[in-house]
A protein has these predicted regions:
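Short, linear, compositionally biased motifs with a strong N-terminal bias
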Residues: 10-11
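Sec-dependent signal peptide recognition
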Residues: 2-7
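The canonical Cys-X-X-Cys-His
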Residues: 117-129
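Extracytoplasmic c-type cytochrome modules immediately beyond a signal peptide or single-pass transmembrane anchor
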Residues: 19-117, 133-142
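C-terminal motif of bacterial Sec signal peptides marking the signal peptidase cleavage site
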Residues: 14-15
């Protein structure tokens, strides 16, 4: 009987203890923000997809269609970091658009013109935002 009473007392003591929950707080509420692409980042993603389709059409001997006018937004799209929209970028953007326009106007040398457009992308990305270079290189037609 003494053992039962002792057991009840021990269980009772442990069950009545309050457990405090520790909350980690830095004093500031953190607000989760979803990443939103800048206009330029979204445009470049679209250009990449468009160029993947053009590459496949060239490899299959199909026509490539007309110059995509939305490529011209490269001159006006807002950047993630507006300081990237400098003279160097403007020169490289012009070279890229010229290469693309030549691709769509000269159907005899599409492979060479397409690869020249890829070159223009890489030359710019070597100096600005180098992350996608390996991905861009996959566009080359061998």
């Amino acid at each position: 009987m003494k053992k039962i009473i002792a057991l009840v007392l021990v269980v009772g003591m442990f069950s009545c203890q309050k457990k405090e929950e520790k909350k980690c707080s830095s004093g500031k509420e953190k607000k989760l923000e979803m990443y939103q692409m800048s206009e330029m980042a979204a445009l470049m993603e679209q250009m990449y997809v468009d160029n993947q389709h053009v590459k496949e059409n060239i490899k299959n001997g199909d026509t490539i269609g007309k110059f995509p006018e939305h490529f011209l937004k490269i001159y006006t799209a807002k950047f993630t970091d507006e300081t990237d929209n400098d003279l160097f970028f403007k020169v490289k953007a012009k070279e890229y658009i010229e290469a693309q326009q030549l691709l769509y106007s000269d159907s005899k040398n599409v492979k060479e013109h397409f690869n020249a457009g890829v070159d223009a992308c890489i030359k710019c990305h070597e100096n600005k935002c180098g992350g996608p270079i390996q991905r861009i290189k996959k566009l080359y037609i061998k």
